[in-house]
Amino acid sequence: MSFKPVVALVGRPNVGKSTLFNRLTRSRAALVADFSGLTRDRHYGEGRVGDTPFLVIDTGGFEPVAKDGILAEMARQTRQAIAEADVVVFLVDARAGVNAHDHEIARLLRKSGQQRVLLAVNKAEGMGVGNATGDFHELGLGEPHPISAAHGDGIVDLIEIALSGLVAPPADTGEQLEQDVVDHRIKLAIVGRPNVGKSTLINTLLGEERVIAFDMPGTTRDAIEIDFERDGRKYTLIDTAGLRKRGKVFEAIEKFSVIKTLQAIEASNVVLLMIDAQAEVSEQDAHIAGFVLETGRAVVVAINKWDGLDSDQRERIEREFQRKLRFLGFARMHTISALKGQGVKPLLKSVNAAHAAAFAKLSTPRLTRELQAAVEQQPPPRKGIFRPKMRYAHQGGQNPPLIVIHGNALDAVPDSYRRYLETRFRNAFDLAGTPLRIEFKSSRNPYVQEN
């Protein structure tokens, strides 16, 4: 299996990493903008230059010398992302100039063994190339590239240089996807932050079963896949926890890699997101969940270590989940103990149901009838003198299901009405566990005046 190249954005706080990240991933962000509660502080996303897709990681404000607590854990994960990324873009600030923090990060990059590092000098708009980049040669990371993340100057050239020579994954013809559907094979990624219990759950699922593995070590774009069967259903487990072989049996060891997590999500068609019941729902949980939603993967949520909580603690974690991850309201949620095997069997039933929903075939007549019933019960609101008129609906894609609605003045449909329609379609077609996307196509735009 070949993965998309990974670009890691590194730099001290306030140099423009988030602005660059948003510009690189803006075409994807629009797909999830209407999901209530989805964090806008995204750290992982998909980008594309020409025909080349890639993944982007914003490593956040990097404090390489942090020794304790959450900053130290973030620094450790950033160092791992630097080592595993295909290319690192080190962002500095043209207007602030070089400082000691930049030198510290440059030193770390040189020691990391990462062969592909591009030095991007941001906020260079209105400055001559020499003025913008001159001081940054002293960082010893090659020729600086002046850019403006805010204005878009130099971004395409920067990413084309970053990706040059990297082997992009072959275009998806859909043949393998169709074969997986015919075989009823589910590609399952079990994801979650460190020590959430991924390894325990994987070992519980695999048991002592002898499995077929496709082990392709090499670059970070290679994956380990494990095939197994349960109750006559075929699954392919895509490794994120770190699987090691003992004889003919695989054992999972707890390990966390942001990049391997994102790549496994990309390669899967169902994601099992694990949350630790004995810890707060973290920003990292929300970032991973947001990326799952962005990629359109079906998802099941497993809250692990549930057996160790009293009733008050259980209520607290449920409230916290609803508050921080309410954009995953379509997903089935399970409480489990991976260690004791409690609740694991129903988990796979929900995985199967989410997969079926993601690949559901929705007939045009039935979609249109449901659309008309929804509009009759609650018409879309007017915008000015125009009321959106919805004529018919058809399916535009699977995994996730895409419903295309045709009519007039549909540019005026608010997000609240889109969510109303989504709920109607979900209930009518039993689409639990999968994102559902709705696209409006107007036959004409009444807001454009003809000359």
From Swiss-Prot:
Binding site for GTP 2: 192-199, 239-243, 304-307
SMART domains cross-referenced by the UniProt entry: AAA (SM00382)
Covalent S-S links between cysteines: none
InterPro entries hit by this protein: AAA+_ATPase, G_ENGA, GTP-bd, GTPase_Der, KH_dom-like, KH_dom-like_a/b, P-loop_NTPase, Small_GTP-bd
Keywords: GTP-binding, Nucleotide-binding, Repeat, Ribosome biogenesis
Recorded GO MF terms: ATP hydrolysis activity; GTP binding; ribosome binding
CDD domains in UniProt: EngA1 (cd01894), EngA2 (cd01895)
Domain KH-like: 360-444
Subunit structure: Associates with the 50S ribosomal subunit.
The family this protein is said to belong to: Belongs to the TRAFAC class TrmE-Era-EngA-EngB-Septin-like GTPase superfamily. EngA (Der) GTPase family.
The protein, known as: GTPase Der
Source organism: Bordetella pertussis (strain Tohama I / ATCC BAA-589 / NCTC 13251)
Gene: der
